Amino acid sequence: ALTELRCQCLQTVQGIHLKNIQNLKVLSPGPHCAQTEVIATLKSGQEACRNPAAPMVKKFLQKRLSNGNSS
């Protein structure tokens, strides 16, 4: 399968509660996309793009980094 070189997050979703998020995946800027992308995997299995500058996203990432759980 051919993957397109473009941003995965065309729009971001607001108002997802932390308790509904199973995991956050952070994609750094690169040739495929000029911006940092944050993709939340919800407990329902859905994926939703979040704004990397959103306070909740920053808090979640800081908590994860301080736990020493890097992935």
Swiss-Prot record:
Q: Does the keyword NAD apply?
A: no
Q: Where in the cell is it found?
A: Secreted
Ranges that cross the membrane: none
Q: Name one GO cellular component term.
A: extracellular space
Q: What is its main location?
A: secreted
GO molecular function annotation: chemokine activity; growth factor activity
For this UniProt record, give its keywords in alphabetical order, as a comma-separated list.
Cytokine, Disulfide bond, Growth factor, Inflammatory response, Secreted
SMART domains noted in UniProt: SCY (SM00199)
| InterPro entries, A to Z | Chemokine_b/g/d (IPR039809), Chemokine_CXC (IPR001089), Chemokine_IL8-like_dom (IPR001811), CXC_Chemokine_domain (IPR033899), Interleukin_8-like_sf (IPR036048)
Q: What induces it?
A: Generated during an inflammatory reaction.
Annotated coiled-coil segments of the chain: none
A GO BP entry: immune response
Does the keyword field hold Chaperone?
A: no
Give the intrachain disulfide bonds.
Answer: 7-33, 9-49
Q: What does this protein do?
A: Has chemotactic activity for neutrophils.
The family annotation for this protein states: Belongs to the intercrine alpha (chemokine CxC) family.
| Quaternary data | Homodimer.
Name of protein: Permeability factor 2
The species this protein belongs to is Oryctolagus cuniculus
Organism placement in taxonomy: Eukaryota, Metazoa, Chordata, Craniata, Vertebrata
